[in-house]
Amino acid sequence: MIQRKLILFLFCIISLGLKAQYVYHNAEEFPLYGKISDNTELHFERLDKSLKDKVSRPYLWFLSKNTAGLAVRFKTNSKNLAFKWEVVNNATMNHMAPTGIKGLDLYCFKEGKWKFVNCARPSDNHKSEAVLSAQKEVAVSEYMVYLPLYDGIKQLEIGVDSLAFIADPEIESPRRDKSIVWYGTSIAQGGCASRPGMAHTNILSRWLDCEIFNLGFSGNGQLDYEIAEFFVQSDASLFVLDCMPNVWEQKVYENLENFYNIIRAKHPTTPILFVQNGSVRKVGDLTISSILLLQ
């Protein structure tokens, strides 16, 4: 009997030790990349809260709560990294992996490049926990954790080993002095990447070493003027208009020129890249080149 109690006591002590080995920090304390305005309802969001009653469609506002393109940067000497996060919707889709929808994706800066570490798999409910092995030896390293593509984040905590430290990054990467605004559709938002770091805007951000503001809205990249009026407040080095799959001929003729002029009024010399719809199926389908020729 005494032996059983002793074993149970030791088991409890070990269990408590395992649970207490990480010290958690609020991720809002660290730099957030991919966000134009700090005036948002929740910290991890993409659109200014002043747009709530101005957006053309309620679903557009709903999608703005998705954290596509947002990433938290920090440095630590912890061998392991633990994450606790709570999503807004606990979204599921038949055509996209849960890790891409509502998981976290960890990268480490090594030898001048961002390298994949591991992906934090979400649970079946709103709250998830994951522990990722970051490095074999105790050494200070720079990290970036990408947030979910098709869900929002209410709360995110980063846990480090009990004797480790965590702080703001020393290296500015991706660089913020040559940022890009990427306006588009579900494709730009990240559908259907298997994990957040594999959304093509996030891949390009690492390749080009520049911050990209992801304004991809699934089914809702419809040349809405209020979105252009919002993103022109950024000091971007390039504006990418990648919304053709979500607009129809009449919408393009009605909105494209005004949308373009909103950008040009604030950024008269900044390059604007028009991206053609890759799904042109037949001769006569509307293309950006045909629009410009007709005008």
Which positions does each model-derived feature cover?
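N-terminal secretory targeting modules
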Residues: 2, 15-179
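Sec-dependent N-terminal signal peptides
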Residues: 5-14
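Short, solvent-exposed loop/turn and secondary-structure capping segments
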Residues: 156-158, 192-196, 252
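Catalytic nucleophile-elbow at a beta strand-turn-alpha helix junction centered on a G-D-S/GDSL motif
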Residues: 177-201
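Surface-exposed cleft-lining segments at the edges of enzyme active sites
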Residues: 186-191, 214, 244-250
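Short helix-loop-beta junction
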Residues: 201-214
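Alpha-helical cap/lid subdomain in secreted, periplasmic
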Residues: 220, 224-295
